[in-house]
A protein has these predicted regions:
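Gly/Ala-rich beta-loop-alpha elbow adjacent to hydrolase catalytic centers
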Residues: 86, 106-110, 114
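Acidic/glycine-enriched edge-of-secondary-structure segments
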Residues: 1-5, 110
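Residues lining the SAM
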Residues: 32, 115, 139
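Lipolytic serine-hydrolase domain surface
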Residues: 1-2, 11-15, 21-23, 42-46, ...
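The conserved beta1-alpha1 loop
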Residues: 29-33, 107
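Short substrate-entry loop that stabilizes the transition state in hydrolases
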Residues: 36-41
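Alpha/beta-hydrolase fold active-site loops
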Residues: 26
Length: 183
């Protein structure tokens, strides 16, 4: 079934929550990363949710990735174009009645999209929405360190807990740093 905008999305989640026990009412929103098709993003998130044995509501925000390794700049433009839609999705989930915790998880370039969206919420005075977030997880975030610091400063108090998972041996992040002229 096709949902009728944010209200239809929220109504569908509230209907799903109505039939669940409280311990299964948490919501995780996953934002995929660079060079990831819709199907790959859904599959990756399904695997993560399965591995974590997450019993709550699983939601996936997909932005247009060009799914080409050489389309890095185009993907960065796409994520910025998608920022308003992610803000709307976060606002919708934050306002959902009957939910438990709301946790946001972003991978790779999706982490920059998430941070930009949180920054936008802060800059537009939507601290009420930020206060509804029960955690943020950035997995292998593909964000320039100085950009991240500026985003975090603009956001102010970051949702807690706030986790960043990265590895010095991550070849994709090293390549990203090389492409974007970061040391």
């Amino acid at each position: 079934d096709r949902l009728d905008g944010p209200q239809g999305f929220r109504a569908a989640i509230e209907q799903e929550l109505a039939g669940r026990p409280v311990q299964e009412s948490d919501i995780i929103l996953f934002i995929h990363g660079f060079n990831t098709s819709y199907g790959e993003g859904v599959y990756r998130y399904a695997q993560i949710a399965h591995d974590l044995k997450f019993p709550g509501i699983r939601t996936h925000f997909s932005w247009v990735s060009h799914t080409k390794a050489l389309a890095y700049a185009a993907d960065r433009d796409s994520l910025l174009y998608s920022r308003d839609d992610l803000v709307t999705t976060i606002q919708t989930l934050a306002a959902t009645r009957g939910r438990g915790k709301l946790i946001l998880v972003a991978h790779s370039m999706g982490a920059e999209l998430l941070m930009e969206s949180l920054r936008q919420l802060a800059l537009t005075g939507r601290r009420d929405v930020l206060n509804e977030l029960d955690g943020v997880v950035l997995q292998a975030p593909d964000i320039n360190v100085n950009v991240f610091r500026a985003q975090a400063k603009a956001i102010g108090d970051l949702p807690q807990p706030f986790f960043i998972f990265t590895s010095q041996s991550d070849r994709a992040l090293r390549l990203s740093a090389l492409i974007s002229n970061q040391s």
